[in-house]
């Protein structure tokens, strides 16, 4: 009998990856395709959902072919995705009515400020655990319904999108729901993605009627919410579709929750930080939804079939790896691999601080009008100093979150598990350990996001029996311990606070 595997579709901000894992959690196949970033106006970011679906089919087909694995050898498919990014599509045709509004998109900042002025921020936080921000799906869905050009279709000539939504002709969802719909024909999301919409009550674990009304989203538009690892399955791929097989689709997690799962952070107090486009620090808080006094989000971590939901505290940094991309954009570096070498070539930043608030600041500051800032430059400043300051900014932002996390949870962290593209950079890992004065553990399989969704899907179909099997799979690649004096780290971090202050509240309304 041929070996069997679990597949994972990892639909990220910059591209789509398909990976296949074996029983020991090792990578068998890996294919990747970038998609276009669309910037119609400053602060606006869109993706084409059709391109994403086409790329998904392409990477799945290519990944299987390259590894010599047949679709019939897949016991299950899991999905993980960039969270909050929002799509509205036509129920009948399956066609999007507008490009996806990406999580980084700031076009609804004015609407968020309106909500703040109406004193509804605490009301929203109480229900959703979220800070009221343009980051989440609620204001994005509202914007699409109010502003997208209606599709000129026979059935809807003259009818605007709001009317069509009220008539039950439109569906909305985050990327996981879009992919599950395209793969299985079912309109389903998981608890972790639902918890990021700002429309879902994380205490009652259901769509919140008052929030749906506040943002003008009819209940007929929202997907059914299921566990992240679902024994009753989200559906099967179509035997007549691109895979030519009925593969169970059984697991879904927003990317950061998937990384928490993939890092086997199954117990209260376990924490991980993922360094991708942004950086996302999550701590499992068990069956208690811990409210934050420090600008962190209370969110759903994950849920397995028949088990209580596990909550998490989350700190979201909007720009981490994207700050390194910016160094490339402005020709300070040729590629990301150069950053460590350049940063090491100088002993310090020579007083330069870089605050990468290109799309505002996330936790714990939540300032949508903050903008990217470099301070402390002199005529002696060289590009090496700016590169080093950029890497340091990632470490400082993480310390912002680590301190908030310890204060809210009362749990002192001993080791932080890290993953994501940027952790291949040893210089950054060591710097991170120095700045937060904590041990850093990097696992052997660094694509933990895809691994987490594969684990969720595999558990649902019995490919793995228990989470203990998954814990045994987790292997450390390298550990980093603080080498910097704590006093020096504190001093450097205090100046970071000053630099952040200078970036705040910069963007003006036109």
From Swiss-Prot:
InterPro entries the UniProt entry points to: ATPase_NBD (IPR043129), Carb_kinase_FGGY (IPR000577), Carb_kinase_FGGY_CS (IPR018483), FGGY_C (IPR018485), FGGY_N (IPR018484), Glycerol_kin (IPR005999)
Which chain positions lie within coiled-coil regions?
A: none
Q: Which residues bind glycerol?
A: 83-84, 135, 255-256
Instruction: Give the Enzyme Commission number.
Output: 2.7.1.30
Q: Which GO terms describe its cellular component?
A: cytosol
Which residues participate in ADP binding? Answer: 13, 17, 277, 321, 421, 425
Highest taxon, organism lineage: Archaea
Question: Any idea which GO molecular function terms this record carries?
Answer: ATP binding; glycerol kinase activity
- Residues where ATP binds: 13-14, 277, 321, 421
Q: Which residues cross the membrane?
A: none
Q: Which PROSITE patterns match?
A: FGGY_KINASES_2
UniProt: sn-glycerol 3-phosphate binding residues: 13, 83-84, 135, 255
Q: In which pathway does it act?
A: Polyol metabolism; glycerol degradation via glycerol kinase pathway; sn-glycerol 3-phosphate from glycerol: step 1/1
Short name of one Pfam family for this protein?
Answer: FGGY_N
Which GO biological process entries does UniProt record here?
A: glycerol catabolic process; glycerol metabolic process; glycerol-3-phosphate metabolic process
> Which keywords describe this protein according to UniProt?
ATP-binding, Glycerol metabolism, Kinase, Nucleotide-binding, Transferase
Q: Identify the enzyme class.
A: transferase
Q: Which reaction does it catalyse?
A: glycerol + ATP = sn-glycerol 3-phosphate + ADP + H(+)
Which family is annotated? Belongs to the FGGY kinase family.
Q: Which NCBIfam families match?
A: glycerol_kin, PRK00047.1
Function summary: Key enzyme in the regulation of glycerol uptake and metabolism. Catalyzes the phosphorylation of glycerol to yield sn-glycerol 3-phosphate.
| PANTHER family assigned to the protein according to its UniProt record, in alphabetical order | GLYCEROL KINASE (PTHR10196:SF69), SUGAR KINASE (PTHR10196)
What protein name applies here? Glycerol kinase
């Amino acid at each position: 009998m041929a070996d069997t595997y679990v597949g994972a579709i990892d639909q990220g901000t910059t591209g789509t990856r398909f990976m296949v894992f074996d029983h020991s959690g090792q990578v068998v196949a890996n294919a990747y395709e970038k998609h276009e970033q669309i910037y119609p106006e400053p602060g606006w970011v869109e993706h084409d959902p059709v391109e994403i679906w086409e790329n998904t089919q392409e990477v799945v087909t290519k990944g299987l072919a390259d590894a010599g694995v047949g679709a019939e050898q897949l016991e299950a498919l899991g999905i993980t995705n960039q969270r909050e990014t929002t799509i509205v599509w036509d129920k009948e045709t399956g066609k999007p009515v507008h490009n996806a509004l990406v999580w980084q998109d700031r076009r609804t900042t004015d609407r968020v400020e309106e909500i703040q002025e109406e004193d509804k921020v605490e009301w929203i936080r109480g229900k959703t655990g979220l800070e009221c921000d343009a980051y989440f799906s609620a204001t994005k869905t509202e914007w699409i319904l109010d502003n997208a050009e209606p599709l000129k279709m026979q059935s809807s000539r003259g009818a605007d999108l709001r009317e069509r939504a009220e008539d039950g002709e439109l569906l909305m969802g985050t990327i996981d729901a879009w992919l599950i719909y395209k793969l299985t024909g079912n309109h389903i999301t998981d608890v972790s993605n639902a918890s990021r919409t700002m429309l879902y009550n994380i205490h009652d674990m259901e769509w919140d009627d008052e929030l749906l009304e506040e943002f003008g989203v009819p209940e007929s538009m929202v997907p059914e919410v299921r566990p992240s690892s679902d024994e009753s399955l989200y559906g099967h791929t179509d035997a007549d579709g691109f895979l030519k097989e009925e593969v169970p689709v059984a697991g879904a997690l927003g990317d950061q929750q998937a990384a928490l799962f993939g890092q086997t952070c199954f117990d209260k107090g376990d924490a991980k930080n993922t360094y991708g486009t942004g950086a996302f620090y999550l701590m499992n808080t068990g069956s208690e939804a811990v409210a934050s006094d420090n600008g962190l989000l209370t969110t759903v971590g994950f849920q397995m079939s028949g088990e209580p939901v596990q909550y998490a505290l989350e700190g979201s940094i909007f720009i981490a790896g994207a700050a390194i991309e910016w160094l490339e954009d402005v020709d300070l570096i040729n590629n990301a691999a150069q950053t460590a070498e350049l940063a090491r070539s100088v002993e310090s930043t020579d007083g330069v601080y870089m605050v990468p608030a290109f799309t505002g600041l996330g936790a714990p500051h939540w300032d949508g009008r903050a903008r990217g800032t470099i301070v402390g430059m002199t005529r002696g400043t060289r590009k090496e100093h700016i590169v080093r300051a950029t890497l340091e900014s990632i470490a400082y932002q993480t310390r912002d979150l680590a301190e908030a996390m310890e204060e809210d949870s009362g749990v002192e962290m001993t080791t932080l598990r890290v993953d994501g593209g940027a952790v291949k950079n040893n210089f950054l890992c060591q710097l991170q350990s120095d700045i937060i004065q904590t041990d850093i553990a990097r696992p052997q399989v660094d694509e933990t996001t895809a691994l987490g969704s594969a684990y969720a899907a595999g558990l649902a179909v019995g490919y793995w029996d228990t989470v203990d099997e998954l814990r045994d799979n987790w292997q450390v690649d390298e550990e980093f311990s603080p080498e910097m004096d704590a006093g020096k780290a504190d001093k450097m971090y205090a100046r970071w606070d000053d630099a952040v202050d200078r970036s705040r509240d910069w963007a003006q309304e036109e």
